[in-house]
Amino acid sequence: MLRMRTAGWARGWCLGCCLLLPLSLSLAAAKQLLRYRLAEEGPADVRIGNVASDLGIVTGSGEVTFSLESGSEYLKIDNLTGELSTSERRIDREKLPQCQMIFDENECFLDFEVSVIGPSQSWVDLFEGQVIVLDINDNTPTFPSPVLTLTVEENRPVGTLYLLPTATDRDFGRNGIERYELLQEPGGGGSGGESRRAGAADSAPYPGGGGNGASGGGSGGSKRRLDASEGGGGTNPGGRSSVFELQVADTPDGEKQPQLIVKGALDREQRDSYELTLRVRDGGDPPRSSQAILRVLITDVNDNSPRFEKSVYEADLAENSAPGTPILQLRAADLDVGVNGQIEYVFGAATESVRRLLRLDETSGWLSVLHRIDREEVNQLRFTVMARDRGQPPKTDKATVVLNIKDENDNVPSIEIRKIGRIPLKDGVANVAEDVLVDTPIALVQVSDRDQGENGVVTCTVVGDVPFQLKPASDTEGDQNKKKYFLHTSTPLDYEATREFNVVIVAVDSGSPSLSSNNSLIVKVGDTNDNPPMFGQSVVEVYFPENNIPGERVATVLATDADSGKNAEIAYSLDSSVMGIFAIDPDSGDILVNTVLDREQTDRYEFKVNAKDKGIPVLQGSTTVIVQVADKNDNDPKFMQDVFTFYVKENLQPNSPVGMVTVMDADKGRNAEMSLYIEENNNIFSIENDTGTIYSTMSFDREHQTTYTFRVKAVDGGDPPRSATATVSLFVMDENDNAPTVTLPKNISYTLLPPSSNVRTVVATVLATDSDDGINADLNYSIVGGNPFKLFEIDPTSGVVSLVGKLTQKHYGLHRLVVQVNDSGQPSQSTTTLVHVFVNESVSNATAIDSQIARSLHIPLTQDIAGDPSYEISKQRLSIVIGVVAGIMTVILIILIVVMARYCRSKNKNGYEAGKKDHEDFFTPQQHDKSKKPKKDKKNKKSKQPLYSSIVTVEASKPNGQRYDSVNEKLSDSPSMGRYRSVNGGPGSPDLARHYKSSSPLPTVQLHPQSPTAGKKHQAVQDLPPANTFVGAGDNISIGSDHCSEYSCQTNNKYSKQMRLHPYITVFG
């Protein structure tokens, strides 16, 4: 549905369009004519139809496009969809030259041509079409003059008919004149303004002669009349009488002729004129109308009207006839005489073109040529001629004249060369790319001849040896006067061989003599962008120093292009990966650096440089640019740490690695080659330049010095050189090379424990020290022997010996507890000491206790000494004594017991002279000299002597007041006890080495750049120990070790009868 700008005009518009239905919607084997309907005077962008849909072409991919080759003055087409619509210029049917003399609705049309173009113009089809322009009611019918004058003789009989001037309407058909109306003048008497109409339904056949007498009605025609009342208050009793009536007749040429009929008597003496209103109305919707004053003058009698010999005159006229050439003579006769019989000829309802081209002699009726007539402009003239006498009033007759303009071969063929598809063509020059395919249409050639028949039959050809040929644009046989051809390429084009062709096209018609014409087209072969820019090298490598100034040129890359013009103009660009770092001049190819390069951050840049030409399509080439950033000595050497801390074990062999420092230089080459030095070198350490490993030149003694601190300097090889320093702290770690030393109790001392002591009574406290540090000095106490009754236990940490069992009669006597003290080193070192406990109420015989302690020093540690061994025997003897009442038996028994006791005691004394090398039934603990460690040599100045670490030390005074040397005095000569091992002991002699020596060796210490700092003392890496000091308690200190020596028995007469021991006794109770 079309939208009109005004409501009234829209109704006529819509009825005139009915909209835009194509008359041909399919394409059969041959191309058909596309026909559409369109109402005139429509706005822009009114849809007419879809060419693609009507041709059955699928659109949407963009590969097939449409182009309007002709008709673009009023029409336009969408290149992709094929939608045909109106352009900005309005279509006025009445102003179209081809519709001036057209009275058939289907004969007024606009021609157009549409080309359908395949992909890359590989094929082109041309289709013709017509848009039939439908008339709308846009013109108002008008009379020749606003006042029409008609002369009527008085006393004319009723029924006399007079022809009235006709109105003209530029529209036709139903929009043309439909009816005439006669309106009574207001105030003129009669019917007081009443109107009567004579229209299409009121019309009658046009009378043959059209006369104006009583018989003017002619024959065979029915009439509808409109009365005009005579006023003036005459004899008409009603004041009104009918005088005139309007009748409309249909003429042979299809027009409507208004006629005035006399209905009443006319008396000039009573009234000499009448003024009526004649209205004309067309058949449009809404209708248009206009009116004129019809002035009727009553005159004397003119009896007869002129009459033409024919109602229709038809003649042929050759075009281009010279002005003045007679065509035909119109003849009419009038029976009147005198002035009433004199006839003059005038044009009737004729168009302006008729009056411009023809001349009608008013007296003779000769029709002649006024101006040359061109058949190509007007092929037929149809008009009316009026014959009018000179009577008062004059009478008229009308005849139709039809002139057929005959053709002459007066037009040379016309050659029009237009663009087709996407090939540009302007001012007779077509630009064709060299890579077009053979048989590609490059232009549309239309050859036409305005002549008719053989004069308009045209043939066309291409002149000369050019790679082009003409092919018909349509497969159908169309109008021979108008032919269309495609100008195709016949061979490949080569820009390098020929860059321009002058194509001459000649057209010849078939007239006699024939006429010909020619037209030319310059075809310029365009260079195709078929060569990409090329670089001389696929990889360009440059070296550029760091710390540059932004904006410096790094390198220049150049590319060449074998094409020409825009196709050879090159623009350079860089990868987006280095945008901001580098830039390139798009014209010169100079690569510039935008920032300061730092080789230590990025030492190499690799990117692509693209060279693009400016052709269509754009082609490009590329090369890889590698920028190696050259180093400058702008970085100091850098140690991984400002302070390196290492831990090494004491007694490490000289020239052993003690640590490793790591230093780096962000520079490169000689700037990164470094030399390492130890500042303030005291010849204790050296450093390896390549690895940074630090070596010691001596063996470390933790007891001598625990830490070493020095500085390491690194100097690079730059010019000038750069340097850096770091501090190295070396901590000497302790080795478990000292066994625990027991300070209390002494081996010869004992503790008196009353039998009434309660459980958890503290019996004694074992105190020991260790010269080592850390976990090597963590001591653990344990009872390893002499506790068969489980009466005692020792706190493993504090060394406190407590009573844990109830003492009974059988527990009376001496108890020898073997206590072992172990450190926590790896491997562990240990020492063994003796704790003597005498269970009794009091010490009644100190000598006997001293004797028992002395004997216990020679008894193997595997043999328990706990309580009175003769307790059971004494109990039996007591039973015998109780049983024997007799005195003699008692005396005898006592004597025997005393004798046996003395005998046994004497025997035992001889047995305690152990210590001689030839007696191997038992052994005592002996400390072994540690001669392996050089640092302990100063402690071993005395000769090696057996040390009784497994016996009780008893302090006694010599008779002269000096302190008796005990067996344990030998221990002061050696700092630690050796490992226990069996020396040909007798049966039952213990192997203390098997029971008490440590097993696993120290783990291997790996050197690292920095030794880890130990946490707790039981970690794998020990904390640095304090100074290794040995704690002693005078000459009689018992020092034990986990190293066990051979047992040797040396009494040196220390336990002879002449000697009396005065032991220290601790008494509980």
UniProtKB/Swiss-Prot annotation:
Residues 901-1069 are cytoplasmic. Residues 182-242, 910-988 are annotated as: Disordered. The keyword Chaperone does not apply. It is found in: Cell membrane. It is a single-pass type I membrane protein. GO terms for molecular function: calcium ion binding. Expressed predominantly in brain and heart and at lower levels in various other tissues. It holds the Pfam family Cadherin_2. Residues 1-28 form the signal peptide. Residues 29-879 are extracellular. This is Protocadherin-7.
